[in-house]
Amino acid sequence: MQHRLPHSPHQQAAERGPVGPDVEARLSAELAAMVASARRRALRDGDRQIDTAHLLHTLLESDPEVREAFESGPQVARLLGYLVQRSIGYGLRWQSSVEDSGAVPTVTGDGWSPVAAGVMAAAYGRAVRRGDPFADGVDLLAALVAEPESRAVEVLGRAGVDVRELLVRLDGWRSGAGVSKPEA
């Protein structure tokens, strides 16, 4: 039996934990579309909750600026190749479990994993700190990478991404400046 993710604003606010209309209203239009895509991906995968791997997968597919944050095109291709294996490989052990770092209360309903909910709030906080009222894809990627217990960080590590180096590059990012690349 597949579980359906909530679609009405009332259900979403009631069931998905700390990510509510306030945070989702503060996403850029592009990031809001990406979140909707991650929600569809979770549903298609038979998952009750959007987790950080769903968010990472959708970010990599849809945001060119996020792809620029990585060392190379082959690194992005390796990541995407790993992420598409979720339903037949590594992700099978995640089915019927909740992504929970232990730092936040576990949410048992449909919607957002506790870690993904925290990451969404952190992405918005990052946008506010840089003076933007809307979080974008790079804000979300930085928040994902900064959460060491996330499934996204596990995927990044398994795909050979140096998570600390990526976080340093993302921490240097400023609106309009793009992501700073390491010197070759």
Question: Where would I find each of the regions flagged by the language model?
Answer:
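Histone-fold recognition with a strong bias for associated Lys/Arg-rich disordered tails
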Residues: 1-184
